[in-house]
Amino acid sequence: MSEVIGRQRIGASLPRKEDLRFVKGSGQFTDDLNKPDQLYGYFVRSTVAHANIRQIITVEASKSPKVVEILTGADYTADGFGPIIHRAIEGDPIDYKKPAFDRNDPVALELNQWPLALDKVRHVGEPVALVIAETVEAAADAAELVVQELEVLKPVVDVFQASDRDALEINEGAPGNIVVKHLGGNLKRTEEALKKADVVVCGKFNVPRVVSCQMEPRSGIGEYDYESNVFTITAGNQGVHRYQMMIASALKVNPGKIRVICPDTGGGFGSRGH
């Protein structure tokens, strides 16, 4: 096979150098990596789509064998940490706040996501607590003992119902539950073309739920060095710099104190960008 060099690499079909070890089962994914004396985290997740959180009770779960700690959203905020932001971060080359194309349409509503839900859950599976234990089995067993006291609210499950201006807001400040809005192209020319068309077909189309379903589940290994005050996270992802900036923003530390290592990644499809 001839070597492709220089500018010939741009747009060329390049040979993949990692495939041989993958087909031989020699890949190094996050779950293949282990650290001395590592602990295991297991998330307790909401079983309902929409509810106010009255209380997360962890007393009995904390007594389980090999459990080290159980954290809730209240513990996270008490330590002074912030949300995971889904907007432009200073120094981020991808600025979602910039106007779309040549119009002034807001591209994305500024929403903050907390690692552990605080006062409300907004979807089935949203994490409400994190059990940390010496083994994954011990963490999973203790998670079964965490009690969620929830005030169940009406969910929004239909896209047409959800997008109505008077619809129940799942995230406050998002009328019609619209978080991304964009109008592109030339409206006047489009209207003129439709007027001249022999046939115009109109309709509403409901797009089914789409999931970025990669083969490798989301996972990560977190380490902290007390001497250097450096946090290291090893996780398959689609951009170490974005991970670095988002984690630094949430932990309120200098990005230089966050080190992100990306091992082999078993698929992403966009979901591992955050």
Task: Give the residues covered by each predicted segment.
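Structural alpha/beta core scaffold segments of enzyme domains
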Residues: 1-274
